[in-house]
Amino acid sequence: MASAKIVYASMTGNDEEIADILEEAFENLDVDVDVSEISQTDAAEFEDYDIDIIVTYTYGDGELPDEAVDFFEDLQEEDLNGKIFGCAGSGDTFYDDFAKSVDDFADAFKKTGAVEGAPVVKIDLAPEEDDITALQAFAKQLLATYNAQN
């Protein structure tokens, strides 16, 4: 059975909701899933899972959330060769740097040797029905990428 680790940063609750939607999607795919908040998680924990996911918001003018900075820096030092990763998160399309932290984390994962299992998912504010469908498809694609490599 495949395993997945979802680490999230959430200020308004939108990204925690995204993490919960992904958790349910993976459970429905018979994936053993663990979810934790970013400030309570060490980046090295990703080594223990097959599929590694970050869910984050973007703060201010395209900045990482304060509580995610240490994790972000530590992540880039990890060796996650052979692992599958995916990034998702919320933002506000009002801003020029819409959900930029999602892309920043995807770039950080690429430095670890992990394989991007699905394109990033960016959600405008809170997830709505079409976003839930996109997140379910995201989870399926991550699992399909994992299965194709194992």
Where would I find each of the regions flagged by the language model?
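Short polar catalytic/cofactor-binding loops
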Residues: A9-G13
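A short beta-strand-loop structural module common to alpha/beta enzyme folds
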Residues: V31-T41
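Short, catalytically relevant binding-site loops at active-site mouths
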Residues: T41-D42, G60
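Local sequence-structure signature of Cys/Sec-based thiol-disulfide redox active-site neighborhoods
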Residues: A4, Y8
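FMN-binding flavodoxin-like domain, especially the glycine-rich phosphate-binding loop
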Residues: S3, N14-E17, A25, L29, ...
